[in-house]
């Protein structure tokens, strides 16, 4: 039977919040079986615990924000994406501020931290959300869909009318039975447009944004001196975000995700629609030799 997994030892780092611009210390700790991923705001009087669940999402305008009893944790998607990519089920994540640090704008720093601490199997069967019937949400020309598939595959299309983006691929498909999260998705950075960044700063947001943690574009070109990490890094980052958003379902998904111009709001609406209809999914466990290849030890190895 495939087993649940957690981090083998605590690991700590410090970074800057993308929107707050404030320094945040984060500690990722092992957690018991069946506890899921939980954030702990150690800067609050009651050391408030905020579970990372789809129904806890309270804001999706600029990032995925979760809350419980008025205590918020924002910009959780990159860290959760790394957790999904490494196959972690249970974690306690302490932070002394509201916002998960942006690091370099990708999941790479979180991957490195977790791998340096190691991953430990736990004595409980790993549970999966197996998609049984297609579920779809639309908003204008935007689409997000989950459908049955014995594995985990994502097909994402973006549509940015910009010369620099047009030169790269605007669609990417990744099947994790054939490709590794770490190499194909994990290093893709967030991106934004210079005029939008200035507007956000006037609103008191994006205070921590810089060329060190995002790809920034003006009207014609990329402003960063560093080359793109992937030739189609823009759409790959949207997949990185989607993996983090989908992990708020609480378990790895066995199914295919298709998106056109989707974002945090539509991804969360998709999960809520799925949860509203129990006939669309089931919770299952797998023997190691019967599990989808996307979740095999080859694709999600242990690091001791």
Swiss-Prot record:
GO terms for cellular component: membrane. Zn(2+) binds at residues 78, 237, 241. The keyword Lipid biosynthesis applies. Pathway: Glycolipid biosynthesis; lipid IV(A) biosynthesis; lipid IV(A) from (3R)-3-hydroxytetradecanoyl-[acyl-carrier-protein] and UDP-N-acetyl-alpha-D-glucosamine: step 2/6. The active site is at 264 (proton donor). GO terms for molecular function: metal ion binding; UDP-3-O-acyl-N-acetylglucosamine deacetylase activity. Its cofactor is Zn(2+). GO terms for biological process: lipid A biosynthetic process. Disulfide bonds: none annotated. It is an enzyme of class 3 (hydrolase). Its EC number is 3.5.1.108. It catalyses: a UDP-3-O-[(3R)-3-hydroxyacyl]-N-acetyl-alpha-D-glucosamine + H2O = a UDP-3-O-[(3R)-3-hydroxyacyl]-alpha-D-glucosamine + acetate. Keywords: Hydrolase, Lipid A biosynthesis, Lipid biosynthesis, Lipid metabolism, Metal-binding, Zinc. Pfam families: LpxC (PF03331). Catalyzes the hydrolysis of UDP-3-O-myristoyl-N-acetylglucosamine to form UDP-3-O-myristoylglucosamine and acetate, the committed step in lipid A biosynthesis. Belongs to the LpxC family. This is UDP-3-O-acyl-N-acetylglucosamine deacetylase.
């Amino acid at each position: 039977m495939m087993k649940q997994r957690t981090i083998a030892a605590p690991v700590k780092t410090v970074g800057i919040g993308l929107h707050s611009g404030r320094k945040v210390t984060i500690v990722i700790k092992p957690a018991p079986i069946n506890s899921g991923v939980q954030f702990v705001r150690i800067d609050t009087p009651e050391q408030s615990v905020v579970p990372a669940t789809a129904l806890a999402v309270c804001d999706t305008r600029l990032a995925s924000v979760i809350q419980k009893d008025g205590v918020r944790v924002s910009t959780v998607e990159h860290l959760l994406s790394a957790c999904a990519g490494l196959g972690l089920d249970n974690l306690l994540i302490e932070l002394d501020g509201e916002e998960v640090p942006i690091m370099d704008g990708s999941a790479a720093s979180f991957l490195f931290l977790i791998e340096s601490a190691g991953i430990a199997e736990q004595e409980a069967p790993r549970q999966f959300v197996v998609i049984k019937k297609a579920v779809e949400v639309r908003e204008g020309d935007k689409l997000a869909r989950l459908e049955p598939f014995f594995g985990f595959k994502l097909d994402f299309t973006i549509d940015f009318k910009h010369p620099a983006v047009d030169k790269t691929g605007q669609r990417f498909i990744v099947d994790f039975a054939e490709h590794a999260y770490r190499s194909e998705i994990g290093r893709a950075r967030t991106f934004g447009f210079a005029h939008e960044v200035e507007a956000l700063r006037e609103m008191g947001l994006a205070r921590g944004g810089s060329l060190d943690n995002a790809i920034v574009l003006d009207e014609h070109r990329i402003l960063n001196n560093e080359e793109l990490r992937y030739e189609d890094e823009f759409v790959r980052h949207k997949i990185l975000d989607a993996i983090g958003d989908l992990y708020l379902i609480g378990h790895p998904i066995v199914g295919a995700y298709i998106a056109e111009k989707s974002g945090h709001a539509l991804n969360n609406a998709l999960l809520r629609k799925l949860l509203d209809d129990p006939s669309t999914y089931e919770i299952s466990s797998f023997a190691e030799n019967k599990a989808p290849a996307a979740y095999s030890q080859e694709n999600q190895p242990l690091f001791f």
